[in-house]
Amino acid sequence: MKNYNYLILLFVLLLSFNLTAQQNSEEVTAASRTAEKLNEASNSTTIISEKEISSKKSFNVLSLLEGTVGVNVSRQGVNSFNVSLREGVDVFSTRTVLLSDGRELNTYGLNFFDASASTLSGLDIARVEVVRGSSSAVYGLGASSGVISFTTKNPFDYAGTTIQVSSGGITKFGGSILAGSAKNVQSNWNLLDVNFRHADHNEDKSFGYKINARYSENSDWLVGDQTSQTIGGELPVMHSFNFDTSLYFKGEDYDVTTTFGLNDTENISRRKMWGEEKRGVSSKFFNVKVNSGNFHAQYNYVQNDTKENYNYWIGADHGIDSQQSHFQLGYELSLPSLSTELNFGADNRLIKFDTGGKVFGSYEDEDDFRTVGAFVSSKTKLFDNVDVLFQGRYDHFNVINEGAFSPKGVIFVKDNTGGTLRLSMSQSNNPDDAYTLFSDFSTQSLGSNGSYMGPYGNKRGLTFNNPTWKPWPNLESFVALHPTPRLDILGISHFHVMLGVLQPFAQTMIQTAMATGNMLLLYPVQNIELVIASMLSGANYTDFILHDGLGNPMDLKGSDTSQLSTETTYELGYSNTIGDKFSYSVDVYNIQKNNIVGMRQVTPHVAIDPATLGAEFGNNLANTAYGLYRNAGLPAATAAALANVYAAVGGQFAAGFAAGIPSLGLVQADQSPNDIHRLYWSHYNFGEINYWGADIATNYEINSAASLYANYSFINQTEFTREDVGDITSPDVYHLNIPKHRVKAGFVYNPDKGLNFGLSFRYQNSMNANTLNSGDSSLFWFDGFVPKRTVWDMNVGMPITSKTRIDLTVDNVLGKKYQTFVNMPMIGQQALFTLTHNF
């Protein structure tokens, strides 16, 4: 309830504003997939203009977003970034949808985006729209975090030819590369980025075209200590080549744009469980977009071919080839009599994966990832200052044959100062990604017979309906000594224990008889074949204890089959301007996540508790000895006394036998191969979490050329355990992997002509990363404590001639090294000189 008290308090405060303000008339299209005013967008949205983009040259376009409120740019290297908005940060994937002119850039199904392997070029970006919050009501399954939409430059408004060359370096040992020694600068000055853009059109602008080409290469910072031991401490030189060309056709009532592009990239990617891998991929895409009146349609095809993928930790090829297609269409309809604007749309997404059995294993022939969906969006003016918006979308996900409806409702209230209050509720549904669904590969060998440990995707669940156990190879011949071994009994036969301790046990009994002079103790030993035969009874078993291989107890429990997770968001936002210079926005949101996915070891080792085996085997042996003595005619009391000696000695040896074998083998799941050991890791669903956060952004325009900005993002809780996800006894954990506090601020001087300058900083507090939501985060490479950091960035540029300019961009001006996650590269300073010439 306390979360809602904060919302109510803020609601009252926002309504109390009574400031002289002006309305923002800028339009955005990414929030609702249709044009709407910025302050009336369905989601909190930020625009990054072409002027801002061109003033800060970057080696990777995602670094342009680092100063934007609510955006978490996870820097993993010089040219390796991941981006997220309000969802938990992942090492590899993102719930943020990235678009270029409406074309999805993510590798659908994997939820993966690599800007260096895309054709995005800073020379060709006209604007960026950052849409924060759930967008599943129009974009479909998986769009729970928001949208980042890049709009490229068309040839009609941006004709001409431009060449841009960037050269720079990095510091690998801290400090400043610009002020470092000549040797240090020489050894690290190895960043190169060459961009080319040409665009033109005919006289009546009915036809236009553009061409973009880019080549870059770079080394990278040193990797973490653990990774360093695996790959020799330094990552290889990486490169990327991108090319795309677009044709634009304009008629009286239509326009058609076709784009073809290709990319060839070698770099480093990281997976949250299996560390670094060298990634080589060649991609090509074709896109056609048609607009006619209120109707639009778009088709996109992408093919990704991996040519050299090698996971350093696993020591194996880990490439995932794919063919991806996306067809979308939409229609906009105005109903003036009802003061309503309607927007309809439908999508069909299909991606086919091919790993050659190396990553998706047994799922290789059933890993097609398809969703089909349709949406409607309706915006109605109820009163002069009140609008309502409803969006709803239904999607069907073929992998688990499940459908889901994602609704969204928004109320807009415009006050008498020109500000807009936005109150919204939305629900999104997220499928597991293909890596979670289909993974089936070896991460560690368990012997020479092909046995291995590795993940198993949750498209199907692992079960133990008919469990058996499989002994380790060195014990197989020993287990086979039983005439009818019962591997369906999860326990050790006392027959095997008897064979295991027979020689030292018999010797001890003989020594005891000789030492005590009680020769009656020899009788069962002299009839040892009768003792062994009695152990063959099916009841003479001691149950195994199950553990994880390190001695930690485990239950015999299968894994869960994939289910859609649900995320419900309540949001209150207010934006306004004070006078002509100061603008601000405040967004407070509450997010409830249900059906969280975690990962755990499913296959247990089998072992024997020494105390239990000692007691049960000793008792069994005593009963056998007692029977032999009674059959020989000894009185009951004498037989019992002698049998107790057998119980004590036999129990002691049995306990030692159990203690000497920490693992006898593995329990076989119903899905386990018969001929090898397979230690499975897989997924399970648990609980729900609830947290709230806020994004506050301010901007002050000193004059037409200079401005100051500051923003703050806050989340009240980022680590969830015990009663946060279930009850006080729950072992489950969930981490957002986002710091609670993030502050960004800066000064920008960017006149239409002459010198431009920018100085900014980014602060975030410390956090504990747990990328797999595992109860033991020490098992995984990138988990652990991440210290707080403050990073200063600077850019300066000036014209040399009317057509040529030079820029310097310095990331991490102070050169204080930091890591995004444990065992990732230590990020130092990066300096980049850029020369741009317009023909």
Give the residues covered by each predicted segment.
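Gram-negative outer-membrane beta-barrel transporters
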Residues: 164, 381-385, 577, 581-593, ...
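Outer-membrane beta-barrel signature, preferentially recognizing the C-terminal barrel domain
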Residues: 277-280, 285, 291, 319-324, ...
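Short acidic/polar hinge/loop motifs at secondary-structure boundaries
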Residues: 104-132
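Conserved C-terminal beta-signal and adjacent last beta-strands/turns
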Residues: 7, 198-207, 214, 240-241, ...
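Extracytoplasmic beta-strand/coil segments of soluble accessory domains associated
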Residues: 37, 62-104
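Surface-exposed extracellular loop regions of Gram-negative outer-membrane beta-barrel proteins
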Residues: 209, 216, 220-223, 240-267, ...
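N-terminal periplasmic "start-of-domain" segments of outer-membrane beta-barrel proteins
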Residues: 24-56, 81-82
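Periplasmic-side early beta-strands and strand-to-turn transitions of outer-membrane beta-barrels
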Residues: 157-159, 164-279
